[in-house]
């Protein structure tokens, strides 16, 4: 219980929406707890420190999934010692130090891999507890901050990844990945489908086109899925691509087994009401799907965290990887044509899912902050070659 004024500083990043969603889930949960003595502030560190360079990096990151996969693969799988010699480790350092001096937080929470925090914990005098919410299912070196007080991870396998690289097991808690509470709230699936002019007796295949960043080939996929899965109907989420929504609506406007949508705030309802989802394996999306126990097909996952997430879900029996659209269509047909495998996948997800991650994490944060001491003055130094990047 927080009985005196305390402050949590959340460091996040806007490379994709997932980290921001996790941050918002935690902030909302803490606000719902009505703690008069607790204040929570959040900062997109890299964007605030280097707005122009970070914007360029974000565009490269998004395009890397389509055009620069090998380059991103090289970055993701590079050896830890290379990161230690890279300027990226010092990216945003001065901004972070200024934040700590100004805000004087009692606890720092990372919801984005932030290597610069390692500089503070290793090279500076800092006695502020540092906690990390990891938003993927397999460990990457950028998530590790030496001398951290706590890591919140998705599964027992993720915890073992940390232990294998020498992290103290007592600092790693298996909580699941925090998502919005609505994904754990029951809904009337049948009524939702009826309200959207779909047949509740058919198997609903959910496709998230916006997740792939491409706008071609989905018309053929929809047509082939319906041709090879006799009792299926397709819901296509086009995201912000108005061109894709327009073209698919024109093609399937008279087909009662196809519903074309643009951007939607109702992914929760669609996940809950569908039997299968074709998507990319972003950490938050698949955690939301996991909470709704909807088996997933991962179409051509990019090397890096996407592929690692997909491999983990396939290994656990929660999803399948398809390297091509044709392979995805075959998997859909196999799972929807009276195959018990789909039922078994749903049952496995029901047994293995971890509920109420957000609440569990927030309660532990309060326990940590209740034992934190008053932050002291921060001092330290960085290598000369890195000083250009520490703004």
Curated annotation (Swiss-Prot):
Q: Where is this chain primarily localised?
A: membrane
A GO MF label = 1,2-diacylglycerol 3-glucosyltransferase activity
Q: What InterPro entries does the entry give?
A: Diacylglyc_glucosyltr_N, Glyco_trans_28_C, Glycosyltransf_28_UgtP, Pro_diacylglycrl_glcsylTrfase
From the Swiss-Prot or TrEMBL record, state where the protein is found.
Answer: Cell membrane
Q: What is its EC number?
A: 2.4.1.315
Reactions accelerated catalytically: a 1,2-diacyl-3-O-(beta-D-glucopyranosyl)-sn-glycerol + UDP-alpha-D-glucose = a 1,2-diacyl-3-O-(beta-D-Glc-(1->6)-beta-D-Glc)-sn-glycerol + UDP + H(+); a 1,2-diacyl-sn-glycerol + UDP-alpha-D-glucose = a 1,2-diacyl-3-O-(beta-D-glucopyranosyl)-sn-glycerol + UDP + H(+)
- What domain of life does the native source organism fall in? Bacteria
Q: In which pathway does it act?
A: Glycolipid metabolism; diglucosyl-diacylglycerol biosynthesis
Q: What class of enzyme is it?
A: transferase
The UniProt entry, under SUPFAM superfamilies, shows: UDP-Glycosyltransferase/glycogen phosphorylase
Does the entry feature the keyword Membrane, yes or no?
A: yes
Give GO terms for biological process. Answer: enterobacterial common antigen biosynthetic process; glycolipid biosynthetic process; lipoteichoic acid biosynthetic process
Which CDD domains does this chain map to?
Answer: GT28_Beta-DGS-like
* Keyword set, alphabetical order: Carbohydrate metabolism, Cell membrane, Glycosyltransferase, Lipid biosynthesis, Lipid metabolism, Membrane, Transferase
Q: Which Gene3D superfamilies match?
A: Glycogen Phosphorylase B
Report the GO terms under cellular component. plasma membrane
The record's function comment reads: Processive glucosyltransferase involved in the biosynthesis of both the bilayer- and non-bilayer-forming membrane glucolipids. Is able to successively transfer two glucosyl residues to diacylglycerol (DAG), thereby catalyzing the formation of beta-monoglucosyl-DAG (3-O-(beta-D-glucopyranosyl)-1,2-diacyl-sn-glycerol) and beta-diglucosyl-DAG (3-O-(beta-D-glucopyranosyl-beta-(1->6)-D-glucopyranosyl)-1,2-diacyl-sn-glycerol). Beta-diglucosyl-DAG is the predominant glycolipid found in Bacillales and is also used as a membrane anchor for lipoteichoic acid (LTA).
Q: Which family does it belong to?
A: Belongs to the glycosyltransferase 28 family. UgtP subfamily.
According to UniProt, the name of this protein is Processive diacylglycerol beta-glucosyltransferase
